[in-house]
Amino acid sequence: MQSWSRVYCSLAKRGHFNRISHGLQGLSAVPLRTYADQPIDADVTVIGSGPGGYVAAIKAAQLGFKTVCIEKNETLGGTCLNVGCIPSKALLNNSHYYHMAHGKDFASRGIEMSEVRLNLDKMMEQKSTAVKALTGGIAHLFKQNKVVHVNGYGKITGKNQVTATKADGGTQVIDTKNILIATGSEVTPFPGITIDEDTIVSSTGALSLKKVPEKMVVIGAGVIGVELGSVWQRLGADVTAVEFLGHVGGVGIDMEISKNFQRILQKQGFKFKLNTKVTGATKKSDGKIDVSIEAASGGKAEVITCDVLLVCIGRRPFTKNLGLEELGIELDPRGRIPVNTRFQTKIPNIYAIGDVVAGPMLAHKAEDEGIICVEGMAGGAVHIDYNCVPSVIYTHPEVAWVGKSEEQLKEEGIEYKVGKFPFAANSRAKTNADTDGMVKILGQKSTDRVLGAHILGPGAGEMVNEAALALEYGASCEDIARVCHAHPTLSEAFREANLAASFGKSINF
């Protein structure tokens, strides 16, 4: 086998490097292009460049592994950076600003405006600028850490080989000691409803609508459904979410928090039909869509007509054409790749992380798995406590939680105590005129140890990380209550809730 540097120099002389601009202040990524008869030697080959894949690739290179990352799309970053977490947060943030300016909020603060207009094209442009900068940033980090980026569809063609098929049909073979599958997930289709990303859209299409629909129906009131539904509701659409379950916010949310969350969203104008199932959708000649619904338990049918139907019933692992069957790697009943605690499949040098394995489909969970998986390859310890992985819904107000909910503790028969503190009693929330919501802490009755934290309110997505740290290190409610928190800050509500849990009473409520 040729050495890495020899292959690199040989190709450079032959002119097989293609400098591709990635929009980050003139920097360039340098993917490696070779002929199929010149395989690349690698220690670690990562398939997929989403949050799990790109982080794992960088960490592997930092640990001294010769690393290749294969990505089928033109840009790095996977679903999260391109059509998921990042663009949705841009629209969530900007639609919140528009909602404040367009409603009575600004006037109540003494900010008077004669006219507020929505420039949707400009809003989409700002979203795209953020995405371009961040995806380009990964390309720069790959270059900086000497990760080789191969653009193509990766397939495992042997236990020590991956073949990437490029858009032009050419192939690139990578001979590798270790393979890490980080191919993420895809939208779960709704039976009988065809997504065209025009008027019947997935989360991808909902991020790029050309105009604000008059009426939108969202199938699913989980995290993605309420986030994207709230974007278009704030921008002026009449939005109704149809949810099979009896609550909003998806799996894991505390029911008390969910009820309060639903109340706040409804006050903003978001409509919900809970315990209701969608039985079909028909596109009419005028372009509108008739959505057929009925009670989840069965009953009288009803039709809701809308301009845009958003399908948000979840995501499923993306494992198409990876070559798993040929290797004898079978998927579990939910389409996930079975792995052990070191993220190894049944073939020890083939690993899998992120959305293709068990656990919540969260970008930060995939990042953690990517780092510790690669550290394990290098002989390090592998540890992740999924109970300490936080979840966030980025609406306004935000919802965030980590650890156990009240419902889970009851189901597990664990005796617990509760501490609550409303943002209405928090001085910073008062000065911001943003007081909806509360902090709820669950502590073990016998030991005072923090078991769960549930936050509904401004800055919840930032505050929950203090709770995750407390859970990871086994802190008690008293530990947090005795830590001095700056005043006036929203995080004081977190301290006060822990005071209530540990001592039975907070100070300011």
From Swiss-Prot:
Effect of K89E: Abolishes dihydrolipoyl dehydrogenase activity. Does not affect interaction with PDHX
Activity control: Disruption of native heterodimer state inhibits primary dihydrolipoamide dehydrogenase activity and induces serine protease activity.
PTM comment, free text: Tyrosine phosphorylated.
Positions with a binding annotation for NAD(+): G220, A221, G222, V223, I224, G225, V226, E227, E243, V278, G314
Location within or outside the cell: Mitochondrion matrix; Nucleus; Cell projection, Cilium, Flagellum; Cytoplasmic vesicle, Secretory vesicle, Acrosome
Record annotation: effect of changing H485A: Loss of dehydrogenase activity. Increases proteolytic activity
Name this protein carries in UniProt: Dihydrolipoyl dehydrogenase, mitochondrial
Species annotation: Homo sapiens
Lineage: Eukaryota, Metazoa, Chordata, Craniata, Vertebrata
Annotated gene: DLD
